[in-house]
């Protein structure tokens, strides 16, 4: 499937990789990056699992290129400094729109679920005729992930859109790039609700143990997808095409029967990967396009 997709892509200006001055002469076959949705130490540990697995599965040397923030991770791909990127729905939408040679290689098997957290006291004090749910954000203070996060900002906006809500219905909001810090924003009273992703059957997986008595799940979305792997094809570079196909196949074969594969899936809390479908990311990107065109671009919690 990938081979046909890659060959059908029209040639465009080949990008030159600009390696950072701190790197020695580069012997890597491919470079991979990811938006830093957790601390850099955690990102590095996770990527070490990925590059080790890919080395064992394909024989390729894949170098991890750390990103300063979400926007920087996208820029690394746009500038040709990374050939592969693990993205959520916003990063994928942005890169596939900006780069004609960007190709979705694999997508996560359905395992993503959006979770809305509130204070347990608020839930207990609701009137009997009040139903907690997504509409509860109206007129409230809400915490999201990074403005460029798919799982913790764009996914909530899409969920709100399906309920006839927009970001204008929220009183105040804030962005917290490190998603694991979001539950504490409710506990300390900075916001009334936060949106966090769940990647397992445990929807409260990101609620820290000390906060479990204070916080409660207000609403959960349906089982869905958010993450996928994008590769940048170079139409005239047959070796690059072959390398991308090897990486694609390695991700498709990821399972927990071997230690290195189990380490990757456990690090990302995913059941595995499969080929892209007409629904994801294609149909999802159409919904994102409609959302952004209707709101004049990507909303933000920052004051203008």
Question: Residue ranges of each PLM-predicted region?
Answer:
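A conserved helix-loop-strand patch within extracytoplasmic ligand-binding domains
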Residues: 108-163
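A structural signal for short loop-to-beta-strand junctions that line the ligand-binding cleft
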Residues: 100-109, 143, 218
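N-terminal hydrophobic or amphipathic helices and topogenic motifs
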Residues: 3-75, 259-304
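Pocket-lining segment of extracytoplasmic ligand-binding domains
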Residues: 140-240
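Hydrophobic residues within well-ordered alpha-helices
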Residues: 77-78, 137, 186-187
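Beta->alpha turn/N-cap motifs
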Residues: 34, 66-70, 81-100, 108, ...
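Periplasmic-binding protein-like
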Residues: 27-31, 35-37, 108-116, 208-251, ...
């Amino acid at each position: 499937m990938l081979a046909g997709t890659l060959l059908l892509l029209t040639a465009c200006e080949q990008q030159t990789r600009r390696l950072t001055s701190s790197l020695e002469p580069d012997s890597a076959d491919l470079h991979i990056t990811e938006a830093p949705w957790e601390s850099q130490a955690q990102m590095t540990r996770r990527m070490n699992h990925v590059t080790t697995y890919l080395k064992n599965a394909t024989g390729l040397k894949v170098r991890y290129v750390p990103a300063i923030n979400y926007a920087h991770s996208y820029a690394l791909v746009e500038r040709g400094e990374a050939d592969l990127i693990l993205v959520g729905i916003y990063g994928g939408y942005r890169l596939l729109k900006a780069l004609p040679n960007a190709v979705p290689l694999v997508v996560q098997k359905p395992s993503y679920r959006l979770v809305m957290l509130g204070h347990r006291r608020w839930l207990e004090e609701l009137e009997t005729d009040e139903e907690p749910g997504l509409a509860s954000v109206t007129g409230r203070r809400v915490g999201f992930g990074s403005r460029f996060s798919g799982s913790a900002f764009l996914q909530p906006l899409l969920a709100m859109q399906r309920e006839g809500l927009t970001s204008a219905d929220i009183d105040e909001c804030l962005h917290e790039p490190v998603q694991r810090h979001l539950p504490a924003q409710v506990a300390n009273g900075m916001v009334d609700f936060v949106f966090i992703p769940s990647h397992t059957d445990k929807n409260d997986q990101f609620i820290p143990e000390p906060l479990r008595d204070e916080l409660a799940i207000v609403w959960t979305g349906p089982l869905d997808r958010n993450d996928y792997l994008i590769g940048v094809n170079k139409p005239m570079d047959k070796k690059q095409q072959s390398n991308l196909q090897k990486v694609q196949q390695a991700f498709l074969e990821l399972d927990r029967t071997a230690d290195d594969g189990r380490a990757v899936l456990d690090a990302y809390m995913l059941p595995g990967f499969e080929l892209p479908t007409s629904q994801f990311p294609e149909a999802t990107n159409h919904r994102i396009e409609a959302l952004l065109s209707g709101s004049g671009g990507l909303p933000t919690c920052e004051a203008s």
